[in-house]
Structures are given as C-alpha cells and as structure tokens.
C-alpha cells in the first residue's frame, strides 16, 4: 500500500499556516492578507498582479479582491506599468513595513520551532525532494497541455 504523501504534504502546509495564522491574530490580518504581504515583500519590487498571483498559487481575480483590501488598509499601492498599461505594479507602503517585520518575525520564529530537532542537512534534503516533486508535477502538466 502506498503512503498518502500528497495528502500528508497538504495537511502539513495547512496546519503550519494555521499555526502562523493563529500567532498573527493580534495584527488583525487574514491568512490571505499576510500570505500576500509576505510574498510581495520577498519578491523583487514592483511585481505585477499576474506575477504575484503565480507566486502565491492563486488565480488573478482572487488576488484582486485581496489587493483591494490591502490598498484600503494603506499597506500597498498599485501603479500602471509603463510598458504595459493593462498591467499593474504592486508596491508596499511605508506603513506596511512594521507589519511586514512582525509577520516575518512570527514566520521565522515558528519555522525554527517547527524544525526543532531536524538538522540543517535534513532540511536541505527535504527542500531538494520537494523541489524535485514540484518539477515532476510541472513536467506532467506540460505534457498534458
């Protein structure tokens, strides 16, 4: 009998995110908000909405609603791209900086706690295995297109 690896990985991501989400409750950010802010911060500046949606792994229409909410909170701005007027570039505002620092601190601290007892070499090996699984899955998608 094969182990349900896909389900195990999905559950791991779900419970890890839920733990971070619980710890970020004092910031009054939804999971969608902090995941989006975290990705904007760690991607090169001025990403387009399309690039950000791909990085997060969601559809662009879903992202637009989240970006609207973050813009209303004064945490991001969107600017029309000079090269493609249909595209919008996303920038963090100054008021987002302390929130980003708090989010990153919680994520980093939680990661350290979750990985307690696992050697850096084991973490590196796991990262390589996950990257290989992703590469295989993407290749399968391309072959079916």
From Swiss-Prot:
Regions recorded as binding DNA: 49-72
Single annotated GO MF: DNA-binding transcription factor activity
SMART domains assigned: HTH_MARR
Matches recorded under SUPFAM superfamilies: Winged helix' DNA-binding domain
Annotated keywords: Activator, DNA-binding, Repressor, Transcription, Transcription regulation
Pfam families: MarR
InterPro entries linked: HTH_MarR-typ, MarR/SlyA-like, Tscrpt_reg_MarR-type_CS, Tscrpt_reg_SlyA, WH-like_DNA-bd_sf, WH_DNA-bd_sf
Domain named HTH marR-type: residues: 2-135
Role description: Transcription regulator that can specifically activate or repress expression of target genes.
Similarity annotation: Belongs to the SlyA family.
Quaternary state and interactors: Homodimer.
Protein name: Transcriptional regulator SlyA
Organism: Pectobacterium atrosepticum (strain SCRI 1043 / ATCC BAA-672)
Gene assigned in the entry: slyA
């Amino acid at each position: 009998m094969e182990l349900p690896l896909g389900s195990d990985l999905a559950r791991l991501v779900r419970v890890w995110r839920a733990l971070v989400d619980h710890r970020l409750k004092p910031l009054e950010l939804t999971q969608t908000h902090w995941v989006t802010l975290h990705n904007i911060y760690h991607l090169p500046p001025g990403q387009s909405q399309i690039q950000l949606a791909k990085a997060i792994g969601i559809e662009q229409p879903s992202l637009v609603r989240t970006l609207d909410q973050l813009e209303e909170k004064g945490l991001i701005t969107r600017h029309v791209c000079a090269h493609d007027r249909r595209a919008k570039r996303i920038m963090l505002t100054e008021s987002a900086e302390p929130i980003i620092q708090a989010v990153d601190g919680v994520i980093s601290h939680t990661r350290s706690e979750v990985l307690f007892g696992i050697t850096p070499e084991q973490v590196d090996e796991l990262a390589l295995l996950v990257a290989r699984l992703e590469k295989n899955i993407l290749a399968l998608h391309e072959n079916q297109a």
